Regions:
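Gly/Ser/Thr-enriched, mixed-charge loops and adjacent short helices
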Residues: 12, 16, 20, 36-45, ...
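N-terminal small/polar loop signature for handling phosphorylated ligands or for N-terminal nucleophile
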Residues: 88-151, 242-305
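Phosphate-binding and adjacent anionic-ligand microenvironments
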Residues: 286, 290-292, 315, 333-449
Length: 449
């Protein structure tokens, strides 16, 4: 191990506010474990429009308290230059999420920022809702969404107008990410950052407001038998509250996946798009003769649906198929309403919008761009992201998508039809739109460049 690298590690250890990660680095240093140290010091974890996301491990290349503190301090500097004064922080139930939320809250409150913290692990859409509903300038969500269990992340939402961009409780876009990244790079000592415990816990009334608003999407509850899985994430509590408020009582939980578990023990990857991820839910649906399977990813901002297809048996609807279903039935709130999807999605929603005389816009990849469309009525991306109620959550929301598809299936059943029948009607008008996802997983971005 060369002396320059060894000194870099020693300096980080001295500045690490977390005794546990500092001790781990010191142990690797003492045992001359350069392999692990190089993994932890492979450059700084890069901050971008998706915030931070990476493996939970010591050093500048991982998600840990030191990196979270440094990032929070950079956001504080950005906020002060922009005249922003308040933040709300949420978290999922992944490894390190609670510690990272507390560290972030300590940095923000120590800098004099009004800091609110959601009471317990909750879906990402609740944080997006709270950012707007509480009138906060910034929202922070500690989550890695549907990443593998060893990962965690740090997402940033904005509540107002920055650089002429109206955020309204949506994720940051360029150039805001670069402005924040520049401030993060200017943070020197991590250990000497002022920390305080002056944050406030947000009362659960904010959850009740979200539940009430979202439940209004379903005005005619039925008796469909629906299987639900939270994929070991944080969706169960909130989704059950929404369905109960809306009058849907016949939910069958996948008990083995209903409660938060950061190890995601029953799935290879906690992503409903992954082959096999919904097998357990589909097996329960088959045995119970259910009408529908609904799945959220671990932070419940995405929604997957499986149906019993007479031709092939139970299958998962592709994201574009579900997008077409929503676009066909979602009401046009006004002549100003706009449908939108990203360039990686099908062209079917554009055709449906044209037939319904609804304005349509196509955006760059990522829901952060869809959320910036003014007068958005419905937005989606093929990766199971749907915004069916932008007035409540101006971002993808797996809970609202779930209750809405339950209502759609109920209404169709009342007419003696199914979701497949509706899709057939759509294809008969616009032509069949085939779609298939191909996923290639790599450890480093350089492998695909």
């Amino acid at each position: 191990m060369d002396q320059h690298f060894s000194q870099e590690v020693k300096e980080w250890i001295l500045d690490d506010p977390d005794a546990l990660t500092a001790a781990q680095l010191q142990s690797w240093l003492d045992s001359d474990n350069e392999i692990e140290l190089r993994k932890s010091f492979n450059g700084f974890l890069q901050f971008g429009t998706a915030g931070l996301r990476g493996p939970v491990r010591p050093g500048p290349s991982g998600m840990n308290r030191a990196v979270v503190a440094r990032t929070s301090a950079g956001i504080v500097a950005f906020m002060k230059k922009q005249g922003l004064t308040s933040v709300v922080i949420g978290r999922d139930a992944r490894h390190g999420s609670k510690e990272f939320a507390v560290e972030s809250a300590a940095i923000f409150s120590g800098a004099g920022i009004k800091t609110l913290v959601l009471s317990h692990p909750l879906p990402t859409p609740v944080l997006a809702f709270a950012t707007n509903e509480l009138g906060c300038d910034v929202g922070i969500m500690i989550t890695a969404s549907h990443n593998p269990p060893q990962d965690n992340g740090f997402k940033v939402y904005l509540g107002g107008v920055i650089d002429s961009i109206s955020y309204r409780g949506s994720q940051i876009t360029s150039p805001t990410d670069s402005l924040i990244a520049d401030e993060i790079l200017r943070v020197n000592s991590i250990k000497s950052l002022v920390r305080a415990d002056k944050w406030s816990i947000v009362e659960d009334q904010i959850i009740e407001k979200y539940v009430t608003r979202t439940a209004r999407l379903a005005m005619n509850p039925g008796k469909l038998k629906i299987v639900y899985t939270a994929m070991h994430g944080v969706g169960t509590e909130t989704l059950l509250a929404v369905f109960k408020k809306a009058g849907f009582d016949a939910l069958i939980l996948v008990d083995a996946q209903a409660q938060p578990d950061p190890d995601f023990p029953t799935v290879a990857f906690p992503n409903p798009e992954e082959p096999g991820a919904m097998d357990l839910a589909i097996e329960i649906a088959r045995k119970s003769h259910a009408d529908l399977v609904i799945a959220n990813d671990p932070d419940a901002d995405r929604c997957a649906v499986a149906i019993d297809d007479p031709l092939v048996g139970w299958r998962i609807l592709r994201g574009d198929e579900l997008g077409a279903v929503f676009a066909q039935v979602i009401p046009q709130n006004s002549s100003l309403g706009v449908f939108a999807n990203s360039i990686v999605s099908s062209t079917i929603v554009k055709k449906i919008a044209e037939q319904r005389s609804i304005k349509f816009e196509e955006t760059l990849t990522g829901f952060k761009w869809i959320s910036k469309i003014q007068n958005l009525s419905f937005g989606y991306e093929e990766a199971l992201g749907y915004c069916v109620d932008p007035e409540t959550v101006n971002d993808k929301d797996g809970i609202s998508a779930a209750i809405y598809i339950a209502q759609i299936a109920t209404d169709l059943a009342g007419d003696g039809k199914t979701i497949l029948d509706l899709l057939d009607e759509i294809w008969s008008v616009h032509g069949y739109h085939a779609t298939e996802q191909i996923s290639i997983r790599v450890e480093e971005i350089s492998q695909v460049m």
